[in-house]
Amino acid sequence: MSPVLAGVLQLLALTAALALAHVPLGNYLARVYSSPKHLRIEKWIYKSIGADPDTEMRWPAYLRGVLAFSLAGVLFLYLLQRLQGVLPGSLGFASIDPDQAFNTAASFVANTNWQSYYGEQAMGHVVQTAGLAVQNFVSAAVGIAVAVALVRGFARSRTGELGNFWADLVRGVVRVLVPIAAVGAVILVACGVIQNFSGIHEVGQFMGGTQEWNGGAVASQEVIKELGTNGGGYFNANSAHPFENPTPFTNLFEIFLILLIPVALTRTFGIMTGSVRQGYAILGTMAAIWAGFVALMMWTEFAHHGPALQAAGGAMEGKELRFGIGGSSLFAVTTTLTSTGAVDSFHSSYTGLGGGITMLGMMLGEIAPGGVGSGLYGMLVMAVVAVFIAGLMVGRTPEYLGKKIGTREIKFAACYILITPALVLVFTAAAMALPTPGDSMTNSGAHGFSEILYAYTSASNNNGSAFAGLNADTQWFNSTLGLAMLLGRFVPMVFVLALAGSLARQQPVPATAGTLRTEKPLFAGLLAGAVLIITGLTYFPALALGPLAEGLAA
């Protein structure tokens, strides 16, 4: 079988699996976040944290819950790393340095999972399981909760109440993430992913000498790493490591886990707003962008430029033979168009244009289909902008789902869109202008600039993947990337929740003959165009200096 055909068949199998899961999981999520009943274990959790799950919150109270919970998570994870040297199950690893502990705590709480450390050489069992794995669950649940709050803003009228953050958080963990992760972990273990608490083993090599291998609770962390679009690997090689991702089947299964909840949430959006077709319009836009990026990436990496690449079947540098170009390209596009950041190949080794595609996927805002929760609310904000643009073109007040998009709403949407590019470009410019950050660059020229641009794009968009040529374990990068991750995660949430509160207070406007039909393919095309044009205008100069210059020079 040719590598191209193998890649196409994987794409078709993945699409079929997602299509089968879309309706039942989307319906289930709608029931979870609409049910007035609480499970017994949920009641125990509410009692233990002193929360009243039946109290409705306005957007400032909802935001305070998000920020307070996340701040507590940062402090706990920071202290856990700083105390690792005296904790049991540390495997003899020392405590983490302050700047790296801050970076890692910010990274995992912000659902970014940027890693400036070698997982198997720095983190013991306690930090991995009680710290990092726990944040993989709760940070994903926070993202879903904020997305559901925005959906309620569209669905509700004449009220400022958006639900209860603590109830949404707990339900996301207990009813959604834990059950799916439990089943997924069993599947991964059955396919060869390790799950144990063994120590460090010294093994012999075929060519002589010895090598140290770590055990660990890898399968349980691997599944939520993908399902929660987190991305932080147990091992430094991430999902390229055979202990995390041993076969082509596990590779495809992990891609399925990454896309599962973001795709299903579009169905949940349609059900909760009373129009399933609106959900399909959003899903269609996401799917079209994702499919276009996959096709472009495969074409770029399969393109033959000389006899060596032709003999290898394409650009195989940095890719695992067991996955090939098809599986690697599919994973790379999926992980950067969502907020996952896990890798089964090394993006720095992709062709110049291939690396640019991964970077552009993050620059879009990771909304196709995006991260768990963050993808949906990011695309809905872009839908508000697209409706506003359409209203300007026809000269009537823009409306979306029966809600008027006025000055207040478009200001919130504009602030949401501007915050991430500002972080990316300001931090990148500072790193390039100052002498110290440049010492961390392995490469010079266009590729060296791409390493810096990729790092801040990844951090600010809460992705976490990296161009491996950059040494990010320095005080400058640990501090600035950590700050970018926190600001890139929580400042946009402020505007999302403010937008939700503004929409929820409105009275529905009845549709008329002149109302834009936002469930039609025409609007989906307008939405996709708005996403691509806004991103292109914002980032094109930076992309021209980095991946485009490198790709065109090749």
Swiss-Prot record:
Membrane topology of this protein: Multi-pass membrane protein
Q: Listed GO cellular component terms?
A: plasma membrane
Any idea which UniProt keywords this protein has?
Cell membrane, Ion transport, Membrane, Potassium, Potassium transport, Transmembrane, Transmembrane helix, Transport
Establish whether keyword Hydrolase is in the entry. Answer: no
**Which residue ranges does UniProt annotate as crossing the membrane?**
3-23, 60-80, 131-151, 174-194, 252-272, 279-299, 323-343, 352-372, 375-395, 412-432, 481-501, 522-542
Task: Give GO terms: molecular function aspect only.
Answer: P-type potassium transmembrane transporter activity; potassium ion binding
Q: Which InterPro entries match?
A: KdpA
Q: Mainly localized where?
A: membrane
Q: What is its subcellular localisation?
A: Cell membrane
Q: Which domain of life is it from?
A: Bacteria
User: Which BP terms in the Gene Ontology apply to this protein?
Assistant: potassium ion transmembrane transport
Protein task: Part of the high-affinity ATP-driven potassium transport (or Kdp) system, which catalyzes the hydrolysis of ATP coupled with the electrogenic transport of potassium into the cytoplasm. This subunit binds the extracellular potassium ions and delivers the ions to the membrane domain of KdpB through an intramembrane tunnel.
HAMAP family referenced in this protein's UniProt entry, alphabetically? KdpA
Q: How does it assemble?
A: The system is composed of three essential subunits: KdpA, KdpB and KdpC.
Report the family membership.
Belongs to the KdpA family.
* Name the UniProt record assigns to this protein: Potassium-transporting ATPase potassium-binding subunit
List the source organism. Streptomyces coelicolor (strain ATCC BAA-471 / A3(2) / M145)
Q: What gene, per UniProt, encodes this protein? A: kdpA
